[in-house]
Amino acid sequence: MFKKFDEKENVSNCIQLKTSVIKGIKNQLIEQFPGIEPWLNQIMPKKDPVKIVRCHEHIEILTVNGELLFFRQREGPFYPTLRLLHKYPFILPHQQVDKGAIKFVLSGANIMCPGLTSPGAKLYPAAVDTIVAIMAEGKQHALCVGVMKMSAEDIEKVNKGIGIENIHYLNDGLWHMKTYK
């Protein structure tokens, strides 16, 4: 999604949100990520201005004080940015890939089933369409945010094809954006 993303070319406008809209977004985030509720006022303080940065391909990035927190495409689900995920790693369930998959994931490739079932990888129970943080064997922080394309059970059974779709990874265009004022 952000492989060829460039802040100067892809951002179309930025709007400040009303309190009622912010409340709706917070409720949607709590519904989507139940573990985030105790931390939401710390992530999105009440007095700080919340803005939506609109980009090409119907992508919206939610920012607070210029810090990129969440993004979504069209009216779809919100995904946390990796910078937020590194501060609050418990927001998303984790899946772990083996060392051999790291370079492919960091180049934007989807996570294939064998990279999740080999030694060194850890596959935790998760349903289809669950948003997950992809961790790497021997690494502390998440290297990608993805969406389960198969359930964990099916990944173990089939062990072929795309298991997790790579949505946002380290060093992609969104990662390089850092802040937006």
Curated annotation (Swiss-Prot):
Post-translational modification: Phosphorylation is critical for stabilization and promotion of cell proliferation.
Protein name per UniProt: Malignant T-cell-amplified sequence 1
Compartments, record wording: Cytoplasm
Residues modified to Phosphothreonine: 81
Entry similarity comment: Belongs to the MCTS1 family.
UniProt keyword annotations, A-Z: Cell cycle, Cytoplasm, DNA damage, Growth regulation, Initiation factor, Phosphoprotein, Protein biosynthesis, Transcription, Transcription regulation, Tumor suppressor
Stated role: Translation regulator forming a complex with DENR to promote translation reinitiation. Translation reinitiation is the process where the small ribosomal subunit remains attached to the mRNA following termination of translation of a regulatory upstream ORF (uORF), and resume scanning on the same mRNA molecule to initiate translation of a downstream ORF, usually the main ORF (mORF). The MCTS1/DENR complex is pivotal to two linked mechanisms essential for translation reinitiation.
InterPro entries, per database record: MCT-1/Tma20, Pre-PUA, PUA, PUA-like_sf, Uncharacterised_CHP00451
Domain of life of the source: Eukaryota
Keyword Chloroplast: no
Induction of the gene: By DNA damaging agents such as gamma irradiation, adriamycin or taxol in lymphoid cells, but not by stress stimuli such as heat shock. This induction of protein expression does not occur at the RNA level, and does not require new protein synthesis.
UniProt-listed GO biological process terms: DNA damage response; formation of translation preinitiation complex; IRES-dependent viral translational initiation; ribosome disassembly; translation reinitiation
Positions of the PUA domain: 92-171
Listed PROSITE patterns: PUA (PS50890)
Molecular-function annotations in GO: ribosomal small subunit binding; RNA cap binding; translation initiation factor activity
PTM annotation (Phosphoserine): residues: 118
Quaternary data: Interacts (via PUA domain) with DENR; the complex regulates translation reinitiation.
Domain notes: The PUA RNA-binding domain is critical for cap binding, but not sufficient for translation enhancer function. MCT1 N-terminal region is required to enhance translation possibly through interaction with other proteins.
Pfam families listed in its UniProt record: Pre-PUA, PUA
Expression sites by tissue: Ubiquitous. Over-expressed in T-cell lymphoid cell lines and in non-Hodgkin lymphoma cell lines as well as in a subset of primary large B-cell lymphomas.
Keyword hit for Lipid metabolism: no
CDD domains attached to this UniProt entry: MCT1_N, PUA_MCTS-1-like
Disease link: Immunodeficiency 118: An X-linked recessive disorder characterized by increased susceptibility to disseminated mycobacterial infections in infancy, notably after Bacillus Calmette-Guerin (BCG) vaccination. Initial clinical features include fever, lymphadenopathy, hepatosplenomegaly, abscesses, and osteomyelitis. Affected males usually recover with treatment, have no other infections, and show normal growth and development.
Organism this protein belongs to: Homo sapiens (Human)
One cellular-component annotation, GO: cytoplasm
